Amino acid sequence: MGLSFTKLFSRLFAKKEMRILMVGLDAAGKTTILYKLKLGEIVTTIPTIGFNVETVEYKNISFTVWDVGGQDKIRPLWRHYFQNTQGLIFVVDSNDRDRVVEARDELHRMLNEDELRDAVLLVFANKQDLPNAMNAAEITDKLGLHSLRQRHWYIQSTCATSGEGLYEGLEWLSNNIASKA
């Protein structure tokens, strides 16, 4: 009896660890998002060549977030980060209408990789504070998210600089990764 209570207690209250890969085209706001979540403040960023990795604590979950550079020359390196990824955050610059097709192509190329078949997908429709930004419904359409029948996905409108929508996204990730465990 005591052992089963201990198991239940630890399952409810033990800190869970989740591996998250955050990718997207260059200048989408990935690094700004990472450090807004980690530090609660805006940091000055430069284009990421390589990666940043931080642990973000949220509720009783420890997210290890890998923020990988998005410049076209280094996108082939993304696949080296796929292994053991439980959640994929794909960040889109909602104001960048010229490159949304490129973003869609990169996303679908990644989702076809076998190592990501079990990862849930969270799309951050970032830069919602800009006046010409596409809303989440438009981004959903342009990224072809409705065609992802075998994938558990969600889109969240965000503004990395204000933090708006970021924790709602983590909430969705925590609920949906935990339910797959």
Curated annotation (Swiss-Prot):
Coiled coil: none annotated. GTP binds at residues 24-31, 67-71, 126-129. SMART domains: ARF (SM00177), RAB (SM00175), SAR (SM00178). One of its GO terms (cellular component) is Golgi apparatus. CDD domains: Arf1_5_like. The keyword Cell division does not apply. It comes from the Eukaryota. GO terms for molecular function: GTP binding; GTPase activity. InterPro entries: Arf1-5-like (IPR045872), P-loop_NTPase (IPR027417), Small_GTP-bd (IPR005225), Small_GTPase_ARF (IPR024156), Small_GTPase_ARF/SAR (IPR006689). PROSITE patterns: ARF. Pfam families: Arf. GO terms for biological process: protein transport; vesicle-mediated transport. A lipid is attached at residue 2 (N-myristoyl glycine). It is found in: Golgi apparatus. GTP-binding protein involved in protein trafficking; may modulate vesicle budding and uncoating within the Golgi apparatus. This is ADP-ribosylation factor.
